[in-house]
């Protein structure tokens, strides 16, 4: 075994390191290889081969610094020549003719501001007004939060590169047996994939601080280049074609790097990839071959977002772009389990301080729900934020407007779906008072009905949804777990769309929260229970095919044997107790008349069910006008027949059958009734006098 010691010529002068006390010094005057000279101020290296001897002398001052110790600690001075030769040829070297020097061309408008514009400081953010629009400099708000300590890069890189002292943000995910780790630094991004078949490291950015150990050269690992950055690929030859096929087809990588300087184009690219992944049913599959490709694009998106496009941009556009970034974070977290780390942009948190009186800095368009947008941005911080009551009021109004627009079975627009996606995320993540939480879940869940299911299916089949937000459906609400495979089959079969049922179930499995911990009244329910939960202000109704929760229950008896409907009422402050038996019962009441004066049945829900198909839809009634619209025979919204029936689930926990008599609301005021009675009395009195005269 030959002893091989690699000598590194350090070009930095001695005074570049910490001061050293040199006890002696000497000029380097070598003899010949037969008579080497040993000097006190030098370290002498003698290298012997078969027919040659080489002598190197290095001044001790170059080897006395901390960094030198780190460098020598990073190399193996006892490695055999045989192992060394094997190591040299083990790694994949990209073909030189494929290393294109890509020239990214920004595809969107770049904003330039007059340099004389003085900023207005709003909550520590510099705002630049120009022609009625406020701008911020992207570099000031998109700074990623890096750890305070030096980053520990993957152990597999120790063989190839010297230690790098740099701060970074790190996030790790598990997919089956694979582990995906992203490292983000101000200069470069690393995606490290650990796989039983072999690891892969992709490093993109300004890699001038990355120094490879002999015999490796950085140029041997360059896979692609742009004008400013390199993409390094470190993977063994025997692994690349078996495990990481997307690298062999470099089209995806080339297209990604072509857009690397344009964040919005990258976000659009990821949205398209995410939607394709959903529609193929590949999300959450541990053997999905496209996960490495998705993780690479995810890393490029965040790296470019935090380092590119540093100039001015309208505030609203900055916020909408960050909204889209959070939506892909949400999607990836649903598809791939996060085990460690998070990515934060602390300056964006400053926008959460804005109240409705400050919204003119963001937009003057009153139709945009700024409160919803800002509160959605807070989902990245979970419980570490406080949302003001003014924002919650604004959010409640936004949701109420969408509900009133579509409560009577009209198709949701893309804009509505995007807003509902944000509202659902807010309801499922941001802590709020129980009243608000229940109200949001109720309205979002009640927008799921057969019309919405058919509309959603047609939208998915047409592949028209442009991003991962407006592909959302309220049927993914955690309170609508009754939307099961069999329920979708029932609805889609009537519309001849049953062939798309599996796609919709995949979407629901991704977008529906795994539990109901935010709703105290039903948090004990198993996620596998096919139950609908109606969280009214003072009572919660759970509609299920069996007994699942402690409460006052009612069994519907008009259905066929194969269809079972059990309605359980749980008072507001009751403790959630899961059960499989009847705890207490109540009778079904018959509703004969509804007064238009007191609106006893406002804040209640009208439920439609079929004797064969079971529960179909629910409509929350807020006020008397909505009740009149719903029950007006001319609107054909309630059409009872021998199979279809309607129940009114009242705010006090009672359940009423709505007969045809009950559907006709008494809309006559008490004053008119008195007038009619007086007229009738006068008429009768006149008739009496007429008879007497005869």
Curated annotation (Swiss-Prot):
Membrane-protein topology: Single-pass type I membrane protein
Chain positions carrying an annotated carbohydrate: 21, 24, 51, 76, 148, 206, 337, 365, 384, 411, 538, 573, 593, 652
Post-translational modification as stated in the protein's UniProt record: N-glycosylated, O-glycosylated, and sialylated.
UniProt GO cellular component terms: host cell endosome membrane; host cell plasma membrane; membrane; viral envelope; virion membrane
Intravirion topological intervals: 693-694
Residue spans, topological domain Virion surface: 17-671
Assembly: Interacts with glycoprotein L (gL); this interaction is necessary for the correct processing and cell surface expression of gH. The heterodimer gH/gL seems to interact with gB trimers during fusion.
Family statement drawn from the similarity comment of this UniProt entry: Belongs to the herpesviridae glycoprotein H family.
UniProt name for this protein: Envelope glycoprotein H
Organism (species): Human herpesvirus 6A (strain Uganda-1102)
């Amino acid at each position: 075994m030959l002893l091989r010691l690699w000598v590194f010529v350090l070009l930095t002068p001695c005074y570049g390191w910490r001061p050293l006390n040199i006890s002696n010094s000497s000029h380097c005057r070598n003899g010949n290889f037969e008579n080497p000279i040993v000097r006190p101020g030098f370290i002498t290296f003698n290298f012997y081969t078969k027919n040659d001897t080489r002598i190197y002398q290095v001044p001790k001052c170059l080897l006395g610094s901390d960094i030198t110790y780190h460098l020598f600690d990073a190399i193996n001075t006892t490695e055999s020549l045989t192992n060394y030769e094997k190591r040299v040829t083990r790694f994949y070297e990209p073909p030189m003719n494929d290393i294109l020097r890509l020239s990214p061309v920004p595809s969107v408008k770049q904003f330039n501001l007059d340099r004389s514009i003085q900023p207005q400081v709003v909550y520590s953010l510099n705002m630049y007004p120009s022609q009625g629009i406020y701008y911020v400099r992207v570099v000031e708000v998109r700074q990623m939060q890096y750890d305070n300590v030096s980053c520990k890069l993957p152990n597999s890189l120790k063989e190839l590169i010297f230690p790098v002292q740099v701060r970074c943000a790190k996030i790790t995910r598990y997919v089956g047996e694979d582990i995906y780790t992203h490292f983000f630094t101000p200069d470069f991004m690393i995606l490290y994939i650990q796989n039983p078949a072999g690891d892969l490291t992709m490093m993109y950015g300004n890699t001038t601080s990355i120094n490879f150990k002999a015999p490796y050269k950085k140029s041997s690992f360059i896979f692609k280049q742009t004008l400013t950055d390199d993409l390094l690929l470190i993977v063994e030859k025997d692994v690349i074609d078996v495990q990481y096929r997307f690298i062999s087809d470099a089209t995806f990588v080339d297209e990604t790097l072509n857009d690397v300087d344009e964040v919005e184009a990258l976000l659009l690219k990821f949205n398209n990839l995410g939607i394709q992944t959903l529609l193929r049913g590949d999300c959450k599959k541990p053997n999905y071959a496209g996960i490495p490709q998705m993780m690479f694009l995810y890393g490029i998106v965040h790296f470019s977002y935090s380092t590119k496009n540093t100039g001015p941009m309208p505030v609203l556009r900055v916020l909408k772009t960050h909204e889209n970034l959070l939506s892909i974070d949400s999607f990836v977290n649903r598809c791939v389990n996060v085990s460690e780390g998070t990515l934060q942009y602390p300056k964006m948190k400053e926008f959460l301080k804005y109240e409705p009186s400050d919204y003119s800095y963001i937009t003057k368009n009153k139709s945009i729900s700024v409160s919803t947008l800002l509160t959605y941005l807070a989902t990245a911080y979970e419980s570490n934020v406080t949302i003001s009551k003014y924002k919650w009021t604004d959010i409640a109004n936004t949701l109420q407007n969408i509900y009133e627009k579509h409560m009577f079975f009209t198709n949701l627009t893309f804009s509505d779906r995007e807003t509902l996606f944000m509202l659902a995320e807010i309801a499922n993540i941001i802590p709020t008072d129980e009243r608000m939480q229940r109200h949001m879940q109720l309205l979002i869940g009640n927008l799921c009905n057969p019309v919405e299911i058919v509309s959603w299916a047609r939208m998915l089949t047409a592949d028209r949804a442009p991003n991962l937000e407006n592909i959302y459906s309220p049927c993914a609400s955690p309170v609508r777990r009754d939307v099961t495979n069999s329920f979708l089959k029932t609805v889609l079969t009537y519309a001849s769309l049953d062939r798309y049922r599996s796609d919709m179930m995949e979407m629901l499995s991704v977008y529906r929260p795994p539990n109901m911990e935010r709703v105290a009244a039903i948090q004990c329910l198993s996620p596998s229970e096919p139950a609908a939960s109606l969280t009214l202000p003072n009572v919660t109704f759970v509609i299920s095919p069996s007994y699942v929760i402690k409460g006052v229950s009612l069994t519907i008896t008009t259905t066929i044997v194969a269809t079972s409907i059990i309605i359980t009422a749980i008072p507001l402050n009751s403790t959630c107790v899961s059960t499989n038996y009847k705890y207490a019962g109540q009778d079904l009441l018959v509703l004969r008349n509804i007064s238009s004066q007191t609106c006893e049945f406002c804040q209640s829900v009208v439920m439609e069910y079929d004797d064969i198909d079971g529960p179909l839809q629910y409509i929350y009634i807020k006020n008397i006008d909505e009740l009149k619209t719903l029950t007006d025979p001319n609107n054909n919204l309630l059409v009872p027949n021998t199979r279809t029936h309607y129940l009114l689930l009242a705010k006090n926990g009672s359940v009423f059958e709505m007969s045809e008599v009950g559907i006709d609301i008494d809309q006559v005021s008490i004053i008119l009734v008195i007038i009619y009675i007086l007229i009738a009395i006068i008429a009768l009195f006149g008739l009496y006098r007429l008879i007497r005269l005869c």
